[in-house]
Each structure stands twice: as C-alpha cells, then as structure tokens.
C-alpha cells in the first residue's frame, strides 16, 4: 500500500473553519487537497498555513491552457513547495510535456505531476454533448496513455477504472481516485464511487475523500476508521 494513501479534500469558504478542521487531523495519516475555490479565496498563504502544520498538499487546480502558460503555472506550484499538482490531459501532449519539463530543475523536490482524465461527474451522455462519442472508460484509457507518453506521474481516474489502467500502464504509474465513500456515506454528486478498501484493491494509489471526514462529528475518528480499514 502507498504510504498515506488518504487525501482529505478541503471544501471551505471560511479559512478559519478550514484551519480548525485541519488542526483536528493527523499529518501522519493523511495528506490534504485544496482546489480552485479555496485557492482563489485564500491564495498561497493557505498553502503556507497547511505546510506549517506538517501536511503534504495536493494543489488541485487542473491547469488547462497553452503549453507556456501551464508550464509557468506548475513552476509556481513547485515554488510553493506542494507535494502534487495537476493538469487536464485533454490539454494535449505538448501541454503536458511542457509542464513536465518545467519541473525538471526541481529534481527530487519537484511535485508529483498528474493529469485529469474524465471528471467523475461525467456520464457517457455528458461526453456525447461535448463531441466525444466513445464511452467514458474508453476516453479515460486514451487520455491516460497520452499522460504516460508525456512522462507524467499518473492520472486522476475513477476507482472502477483502476484495475485496467494499472495493467495497461504499469505499477509505477500512480492512480488518484475521487468518488471514494466509506460504507453508509452519501454518494453526493459523484456518479462513479467505491469504498476505500475496494478502491485500493482495484489498484488505486491515492484516495480522495472529503465530506465523510470533513463533515463528520469527529473528523479525526472518521479519518482513523478509514485508515484502519486499509491496514
């Protein structure tokens, strides 16, 4: 099992509330994920606040732009010292290669760089509406292969896709899976979901888990229970 596979997704519009939650968690059991809303609201200072508390951070901004712009964006993320950041694979091979090249000067200190394939909220019908006339899983495989060709570290994918992607792309290619819900949790707006043990067994390396931990009466107890279920 990957060391610290749990990535706690933070989703707050109040920084103090976010830090109060973070202070209840254990950096030895999880890493944290910050997305577009929180980074737009609170900026790089939030990243520094998280690092000061001993947590690794996945800066989930899903960059998608021309290659030069994305290269500069991932460089900025590296300067912040984040553990992982990401781009949209649909930005294309040249964009992903430019992003990867931009991180070379950081050597072993470079953040992991992964790509988003198909958002877990997207159904086959949703894909058809944007001109992609193949099933979601087929499109995921196509984008994941392109990501590996660009020499990125892995992809975000649904847990249902993990087993085939591992066999297709190899054990060293990391799979980060949202849509993870412990037994009894509300599936929310995620269409493709699994429990944490199911996802790891399927080949996922990192599990993105938000509300089952952040909205729990006792967030640390919820984190500990999920962590224990994976041991």
From Swiss-Prot:
GO CC, one annotated term: cytosol
UniProt KW keywords: Decarboxylase, Lyase, Pyrimidine biosynthesis
Job description of the protein: Catalyzes the decarboxylation of orotidine 5'-monophosphate (OMP) to uridine 5'-monophosphate (UMP).
Enzymatic reactions: orotidine 5'-phosphate + H(+) = UMP + CO2
Family according to the record: Belongs to the OMP decarboxylase family. Type 1 subfamily.
Binding site for substrate: 11, 33, 60-69, 120, 181, 190, 210-211
GO molecular function per UniProt: orotidine-5'-phosphate decarboxylase activity
Lineage: Bacteria, Pseudomonadati, Pseudomonadota, Gammaproteobacteria, Alteromonadales
Organism, scientific name: Shewanella oneidensis (strain ATCC 700550 / JCM 31522 / CIP 106686 / LMG 19005 / NCIMB 14063 / MR-1)
PANTHER family documented for this protein: OROTIDINE 5'-PHOSPHATE DECARBOXYLASE
UniProt KW Lyase keyword: yes
PROSITE patterns per the UniProt record, alphabetical: OMPDECASE
E.C. designation(s): 4.1.1.23
Protein name per its UniProtKB record: Orotidine 5'-phosphate decarboxylase
Xref: InterPro entries: Aldolase_TIM (IPR013785), OMPdecase (IPR014732), OMPdecase_AS (IPR018089), OMPdecase_bac (IPR047596), OMPdeCOase_dom (IPR001754), RibuloseP-bd_barrel (IPR011060)
Pathway: Pyrimidine metabolism; UMP biosynthesis via de novo pathway; UMP from orotate: step 2/2
Self-association and partners: Homodimer.
Record-level GO BP terms: 'de novo' pyrimidine nucleobase biosynthetic process; 'de novo' UMP biosynthetic process
